[in-house]
């Protein structure tokens, strides 16, 4: 018992003299509190853009919209223009909660037979499912852009062009590839078989490494169309034409009607 107490005293004394907190509160895996607002996402570069929007006088919705678009650059598996999502918005002054559902939808001409090549749903172990896991048949009609812009239109404070400016700059100037993004690229070999994905996520025939620089000029151009023309900039015009052309060339189902 005396020895245990003596060791406890030594450990406690060492802790007091270490000059460091035993719990690293700023660490991402520990709770963090703030009195002036907070921006949280799965990538710090995107979160920084959210903070920038708040510093510009934007509200929480402005920041959320900017972060959502930014994640298409920094961590596309967590946020992307080709997907969808949901959003809850609380208006303190009215004590009201609004819900926006912008989940992706199936193309109008989709069917079990077109998707899986059979009229009956096959066993989940069937290789037929690879058709809707890794090919253009897996693509649903994207809702992300519609949902984010709908939130901004109804609840945002800043002009859309103000929100999109740092997002565009980030895609043009490039980002430092995170360990998360590098890992996901490395464990997704299907990216290598797609010409566009290969040109973005590979260098010298190898997946982009952590700390390397990734630039997205094409994505920046899409952001510019959205910034200039809003929803129509993504669901109509040249961006929509490119998307439909890609579908036609790769046996996808999304059409202009969708």
Residue spans for each PLM region:
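Long, structured ligand/cofactor-binding scaffold of large enzymes
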Residues: 52-54
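Hydrophobic h-region of N-terminal signal peptides that target proteins for export
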Residues: 9-18
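Sec-dependent signal peptide recognition
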Residues: 1-9
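Noncatalytic scaffold domains of N-terminal-nucleophile
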Residues: 20-48, 60-229, 234-236, 240-258
């Amino acid at each position: 018992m005396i020895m245990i107490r003596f060791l406890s005293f030594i450990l406690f004394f060492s802790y007091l003299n270490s000059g460091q907190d035993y719990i690293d509160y700023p660490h991402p895996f520990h709770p963090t509190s703030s009195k002036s607002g907070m921006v949280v996402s799965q990538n710090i570069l995107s979160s920084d853009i959210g903070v920038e929007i708040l510093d510009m006088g934007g509200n929480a919705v402005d920041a959320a919209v900017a972060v959502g678009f930014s994640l298409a650059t920094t961590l596309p598996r967590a946020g992307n223009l080709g997907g969808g999502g949901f959003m809850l918005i609380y208006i303190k002054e009215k004590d009201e909660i609004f819900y926006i559902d912008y989940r992706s939808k199936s193309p109008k001409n989709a069917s079990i037979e077109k998707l899986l090549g059979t009229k009956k749903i096959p066993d989940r172990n069937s290789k037929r499912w690879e058709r809707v896991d890794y090919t253009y048949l897996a693509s649903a009609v994207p809702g992300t852009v519609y949902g984010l812009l709908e939130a901004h239109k109804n609840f945002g404070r800043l002009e859309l062009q103000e929100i999109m400016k740092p997002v565009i700059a980030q895609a043009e100037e490039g980002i430092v590839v995170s360990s998360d993004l590098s890992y996901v690229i490395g464990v997704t070999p299907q990216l290598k078989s797609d010409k566009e994905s290969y040109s973005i996520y590979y260098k010298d025939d190898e997946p982009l490494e952590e700390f390397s620089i990734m630039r997205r000029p094409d994505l920046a151009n899409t952001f510019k169309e959205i910034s200039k023309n809003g929803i129509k900039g993504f669901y109509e015009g040249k961006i929509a034409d490119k998307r439909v052309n890609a579908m036609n060339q790769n046996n996808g189902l999304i059409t202009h009607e969708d």
